[in-house]
Swiss-Prot record:
PANTHER family: DNA GYRASE SUBUNIT A, CHLOROPLASTIC_MITOCHONDRIAL (PTHR43493:SF5), DNA GYRASE/TOPOISOMERASE SUBUNIT A (PTHR43493). It comes from the Bacteria. GO terms for biological process: DNA topological change. The active site is at residue 121. Keywords: ATP-binding, Cytoplasm, DNA-binding, Isomerase, Nucleotide-binding, Topoisomerase. It comes from Aquifex aeolicus (strain VF5). Heterotetramer, composed of two 'GyrA' and two 'GyrB' chains. In the heterotetramer, 'GyrA' contains the active site tyrosine that forms a transient covalent intermediate with the DNA, while 'GyrB' binds cofactors and catalyzes ATP hydrolysis. It is found in: Cytoplasm. Belongs to the type II topoisomerase GyrA/ParC subunit family. This is Type 2 topoisomerase subunit A.
Amino acid sequence: MENRENLVEIPIEEEVKQAYIDYAMSVIVGRAIPDVRDGLKPVQRRILYSMYEMGLLPDKPFKKSARIVGETLGKYHPHGDQAVYEALVRMAQDFTMRYPLIIGQGNFGSIDGDPAAQMRYTEAKLSPLAVEMLTDIDKDTVDFQPNFDDTLMEPEVLPSKFPNLLCNGTSGIAVGLATSIPPHNLTEVGNALVKLAQNPQISVDEIMEILKGPDFPTGGVIENFAQVKEIYKTGRGIIKVKGKAHVEKVQGGRERIVITEIPYQVNKAELIKKIADNVRNGKIKEISDIRDETDKEGIRIVVELKRDAKGEEVLKKLYKYTPLEKGFPVNLVVLIDKEPKLVDIKTLLREFIKHRLEVILRRSKYFLKKVQDRLHIVEGLLKAINFIDDIIERIRRSKDASEARNYLMEEFGLSEKQAQAVLDLRLQRLTSLEREKLLEEEKELREKIEYYKKLVASEGERIKVFIEETEELVKKYGDKRRTFIGGVKEVKEGSITVAVLQDGSIIPVEELPLEKAPVVNILRVPFTEGLFLVSNRGRVYWIAGSQALQGSKVSLKSREEKIVGAFIREKFGNRLLLATKKGYVKKIPLAEFEYKAQGMPIIKLTEGDEVVSIASSVDETHILLFTKKGRVARFSVREVPPSTPGARGVQGIKLEKNDETSGLRIWNGEPYLLVITAKGRVKKISHEEIPKTNRGVKGTEVSGTKDTLVDLIPIKEEVELLITTKNGKAFYDKINQKDIPLSTKKSIPRTRWKLEDDEIIKVVIKKSE
């Protein structure tokens, strides 16, 4: 019978799950996602390190790409040779890399999509910036790990003085994960790094006054700076990039369009083909001819127009129907401590600074030890020179080097290394001039030791070195921005009034179009900020303020889902209050929220329950939680404990049969409350009519009618309301509390707004919200 003692039985579903996780992490860490420190994937790092070991420096001759690929495969990357060669080619293409890391000789492909020549025909060597990434790698600045067969050691990461991740960007698709980081301008990145190193507390807004956005190798135009700002705060989004084109007048009164720059990663040949296809299918009828006049001076695509065709109108069509305008997806996913993370632009900069400070620390320790070792030898030599006659005499009488070395150690107190250095001393070093040189060297070594000790002991000193090195790098390699970014000045102070609809639409308005309904809220949104939208299904959606410029819409998860509230984070406080239909309330810190356009759950709802209202949370205030049947519970915000997104919340009001929560308001000491019913009736009562109690009670009846209680609004002097009805009507009303007589909770409200028989008020919005 088979021996089963050494067998371990594992359920197949567990084994499959673990195997898949292992495979996914292998792809994420070992193939697709770059390390935040040097911005390289393993194959890129191994190619560069192999070339460095081969001595392929910028001032050295080229070597065949096939030789480089073979060296990389044989030593560090035992995978397909074509995959390695493709990675090498991409690092040499100036239309792919903003700052190429490899200098190529031969055919390395083109922006038209032409493939590179076979590796046996092309040659390559490292670029100066690649050398900057590898500098100090031999000074114990980074950790090394065994290669695939444990015969060699390879670096886990490069020292990377050059901020490659941001300057060159990257893209990659892993298992269930992807990254897409655009390239940037070295001068801007370097200046932003210096600014952040000097002041770690600066905001993303302040960073982006320096680092304005992507700088693509192919140029192009990004018109909306606000959009870029929001994406760099959240780490995710799509940046619209346009090709650069202008209209020229030609003979005969005609016009033509000349395209001189195209969006990043757009195939020029495919762009021309797409334009031609649109001419053939009739979408763009005004074009008579297309020519590609691109040469070594740059891209030039000439689009000839028919007589009477307006160049600007045709250009709009080119942007609309062809890849002359393209969305670049941004997904700032990187490996931090070997774990994939979605980060903002500040985190990318901060992690690079952290890496460089670690490199400087390790390099300083390395040099400190070297200098201390040298000082030890120099001290021994100086001691020996003072007694050189006795030493020479004794060495002559010694049987061998070992006896002479032992004599020096015992007689003069030298260490073994010092004694050996004395034995290795050449006779010419015994002159008085050489002694002076040793004394001078000793002085210099002691000064260096003090310097390196200061670097090791003080992070502030290391930051100074980092700033100096970064400024030197920018001075040496920095260049002008290629991609134009528009709207930088206007965005800083700009804002827009938007109406948030129940279906998730964001409509920009100067005054709300009354035919647009049902409206959830009207807000003045700064371009540099954004909106959180909360749905009845307990999800919160994020939308950038810049996206509201042309109108936008969040993608809700189902037809039953609708938006019930919206707010601007910067004007809302630190915590959000939610009220559910079944009488529950929940307080959740805004720090728990993620900037996700696809939404994230923020409350656990039971079957049949849903979120009906939201409000800002301030501990010193009271919650007014009211039901459709007109009951109100008033209790302190402090009675609702803060909880995580996965929690249900706590009971706020005890509901009677067939009753449900209508909404909640925050009472902040206002003397009066407006009671508003579905049939357009309003009354004013004193806040004292609703005594403060604990949460979880039945509450006080305040409506004085069987009509549904729609809202309960605290008022001090005056309030402006936007009223929307179930039939889609909307109107404004400004109410001064002096115009409404004081009533009691049992009084019947008076009709203020005359509605149709089948019409009821659905939403009441305080305009200040």
